[in-house]
A protein has these predicted regions:
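Conserved functional micro-motifs across diverse proteins
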Residues: 20-255
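C-terminal motif of bacterial Sec signal peptides marking the signal peptidase cleavage site
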Residues: 16-18
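Sec-dependent N-terminal signal peptides
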Residues: 5-14
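N-terminal secretory signal peptides that target proteins for export/translocation
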Residues: 1-2
Length: 255
């Protein structure tokens, strides 16, 4: 009886171990030009550009590796790295995977068509094919997140963060100020660019649409909007499972 129980325990344990897995998700890639719709161009670097005469709006998903290279001096201290867009060069124990801190897009607007154009970065949002919705985060929200992440913060002008944690918080906030997409008008023959930040996508998100709504392209004499346009950009990524032996199975495959 004891031998039978031990054999059953061993069999169940091995079976559970063999079936264990973790989720993975690849980098975001744009859908084809045919799927994007009219007036869209898809470039080799993964960016999608919407053209309305000489107004060009370009959106490109950023990988953590790219963001770490761009802020290389601020990405070598693991999770404590001042890079506000990633966890730096940190890795999960044993798997070697890099944890995802945010979902980041680079937005570029080039206006050579209208007297002025206005795009509110805080109104950009994501919808997914499985019913999820993500709203863009502003700098104040990210600053509060990092103030709490550092510990000891109480808000206001004196956050109460001690020592090196305060320095790291200020470095992160400074990078965000300089690199997030600015909330300002773009006058004729001007360009504006910066990052749009969202919460990390859930592991089951495969197909998504980035909505850039109510882009103002014409104003009346009082400065009120009289003509707007909406832009939608589609991206997808491979998702699936990774098994203990390192094999990957995409969500449409059968293990």
């Amino acid at each position: 009886m004891l031998k039978s129980s031990l054999l059953l325990f061993f069999t169940v344990t091995v079976g559970l171990t063999g079936c264990s897995y973790r989720y993975y998700a690849g980098d975001l890639q744009p859908l084809s030009e045919a799927e994007q719709g009219e007036n869209k161009e898809v470039a080799d670097d993964g960016s999608v550009t919407y053209n309305q005469a000489r107004l060009a709006i370009t959106l490109r998903p950023m990988t953590d590796a790219e963001l770490n290279r761009q802020f290389s001096a601020y990405s070598n201290q693991g999770a404590e790295s001042p890079n506000p867009y990633t966890f730096g060069n940190s890795e999960y124990f044993r798997t070697g995977d890099t944890p995802k801190r945010w979902t980041v897009f680079r937005l570029n607007v080039s206006n050579y068509e209208y007297p002025k154009v206005y795009l509110d970065p805080e109104r950009v949002y994501i919808t997914t094919s499985n019913g999820r919705k993500y709203y863009a985060l502003n700098r104040e929200q990210l600053s509060i997140y990092y103030r709490r992440y550092a510990g000891g913060g109480s808000g206001g002008d004196g956050p109460g963060i001690p020592g090196n944690a305060f320095i790291t918080w200020k470095e992160r906030d400074g990078i965000l100020r300089k690199t997030m997409y600015p909330n300002e008008q773009i006058f004729s023959a001007q360009e504006s660019q910066g990052y749009i930040v969202f919460e990390p996508l859930a592991h089951d998100v495969q197909l998504l649409t980035v909505h850039i709504d109510d882009i103002v392209v014409r104003f009346d004499y009082k400065g009120d909007p009289v003509e707007t346009t909406d832009v939608e950009v589609l991206f997808q990524r491979e998702i699936g499972r990774v098994y203990p032996d390192g094999s990957k199975v995409a969500n449409n495959s059968v293990k």
